[in-house]
Amino acid sequence: MYSFILDCTTRTAKKVKMHVIDIYNKYHELLVFCRQQLIQKNFEMSKSNAVELYSKRQDEIHDEYQKRKRREIKVIKSDLIELRRQKDEVIENMKTFKHDVVKYKKLYEDLEQEIKILERKNKNLEIETNSDSGNLMVYIANIENILSKCTNKSLKRNIEKQLYKMDEIAYKLKDNFREEFE
């Protein structure tokens, strides 16, 4: 483009040539300087952008961490509330169980006392009934012998009914005492 200036040999042409070369050099220097400034500006901008992005990312990470911790705290609080409720239920159940234990213990002690009293009575009754049941059987046998000699049929039937009832009672008494003491 400026090649015609380079070919000129006159003094004014040489001056113009020098001015054009100076302008071209200045232009080139300005262009290099602008490129350097642009590169530096882009570098600084990218650096500041990187710092901003890094700080943004750190803020986001921190916010996510706080949200996660809040959720965990909320879950722990709900678990704590549930555990307290269960603890209260367990305490109430323990109170009722303690009350039931005291009640059943008292019933058991009363039952033991009654059993001891009944055992004493049964031993006395067993001694009496063994002798009485043996005597009762002897009495029944004697009455049957007498009954075989009786001639009145209606009287005989009434006595047999009574003997049958007495016999059933005697066997029931023996069975009851055997069951209790076995």
Swiss-Prot record:
Coiled-coil segments: 66-133
Top-level taxon of the source organism: Viruses
This protein's UniProt keywords: Coiled coil
Protein's recorded name: Uncharacterized protein R566
Organism of origin: Acanthamoeba polyphaga mimivirus
Origin organism lineage: Viruses, Varidnaviria, Bamfordvirae, Nucleocytoviricota, Megaviricetes
